Amino acid sequence: MLGRSGYRALPLGDFDRFQQSSFGFLGSQKGCLSPEPGSVGPGADAPESWPSCLCHGLVSVLGFLLLLLTFPISGWFALKIVPTYERMIVFRLGRIRNPQGPGMVLLLPFIDSFQRVDLRTRAFNVPPCKLASKDGAVLSVGADVQFRIWDPVLSVMAVKDLNTATRMTAHNAMTKALLRRPLQEIQMEKLKIGDQLLLEINDVTRAWGLEVDRVELAVEAVLQPPQDSLTVPSLDSTLQQLALHLLGGSMNSAVGRVPSPGPDTLEMINEVEPPASLAGAGAEPSPKQPVAEGLLTALQPFLSEALVSQVGACYQFNVILPSGTQSIYFLDLTTGQGRVGHGEPDGIPDVVVEMAEADLQALLSKELRPLGAYMSGRLKVKGDLAVVMKLEAVLKALK
């Protein structure tokens, strides 16, 4: 039937190209009673009646004549240059036309209004928020999202604030995905979860003319461990033995049914001497020693001249113990190979850090990052925040 009538079917893949065909300054090539190109969708305008089409044409002709009469002056305002990475969406008497550009675009004065749309890949971040995983852990997690606009008309017509709507969609999808997973799966399969979030977000944003290219999860900190997790296995291998010989029997009673350490570990515990900073405190057993003092003293073997040249700052740690008292320690990375000890530093510290003993333990075991601790309120800073961020170099030295 189509062959006899002289018409041919337009392939479905060419429909978008057909919508973006060239226009004259008076309107569409299709006719007054047909909808404007780009007006396909739930918010499309109805076809114009012949009186409306006639008025539209007369006003457009008058606008074009006014442009010609005042062209030397009006040319500066009517001619717009659109770069390759942009498209211009033009509204003529309230009706949308097809995307204009790249190149030079002519606008009719007092009739046309326009909006530029950037087609380049852009990125935004989902601010870190507190979420509860499936196993009861509380963590601070955010995301980095890269996106681009593939349909300029939909990006203008479908949603008012595209960036805010996309950010909220990504936040909701991330929340729903992480609530169904335990903490270990979130930490081990961030790339897989990011790919799933990519598909879920695109299912929503494609109708807005936007396509998400990449989603990367960023776990800032674990604010509360899982309810059924053990304390010792979650520590870094270097600090695990340190915690065992510092806490002794109290650590074993805290973890419940954890098997007792082997003979080699017991022999090592018996040979370890108390830290020098506690020599004058009497013959107290090691389980009563402050955990913070032992953890900070354990940093001494990892200090080096290279670390001093990289950091070059002096820190004072005001550690709040579980009893409510406050202990002061220092980490001097300004001269020599660096020093760490109990009490205030010899000079004025570059920054004063205040945190709880448990948070310090999580920081040195690499469960908590300085930036995540600061954003969650678990680390208070008096001084330059950039100096505190240099603690990342100290944490990297712990192997």
Swiss-Prot record:
One GO MF term: ion channel inhibitor activity
Tissues where this protein is expressed: Expressed in dorsal root ganglion neurons.
CDD domains (UniProt xref): SPFH_SLP-1
Domain annotation SCP2: ranges: 288-399
Main location per the UniProt record: membrane
Keywords of the record: Cell membrane, Cytoplasmic vesicle, Endosome, Lipid transport, Membrane, Phosphoprotein, Signal-anchor, Transmembrane, Transmembrane helix, Transport
Alphabetical list of SMART domains matching this protein: PHB
GO cellular component, one term: membrane raft
Protein location: Membrane; Cytoplasmic vesicle; Cell membrane; Late endosome membrane
Modified residues (Phosphoserine): 28
Transmembrane spans: 58-78
Organism superkingdom: Eukaryota
Topological domain ranges for the Cytoplasmic compartment: 79-399
Membrane topology annotation: Single-pass type III membrane protein
Sequence motif Tyrosine-type lysosomal sorting signal, location on chain: 6-10
UniProt-listed GO biological process terms: cellular response to leukemia inhibitory factor; lipid transport
Statement: the UniProt record of this protein carries the keyword Acetylation: no
Role played: May play a role in cholesterol transfer to late endosomes. May play a role in modulating membrane acid-sensing ion channels. Can specifically inhibit proton-gated current of ASIC1 isoform 1. Can increase inactivation speed of ASIC3. May be involved in regulation of proton sensing in dorsal root ganglions.
Subunit and interaction comment: Interacts with STOM; may redistribute STOM from the plasma membrane to late endosomes.
Similarity field: Belongs to the band 7/mec-2 family.
Name of the featured protein: Stomatin-like protein 1
Organism from which the protein derives: Mus musculus (Mouse)
Gene: Stoml1
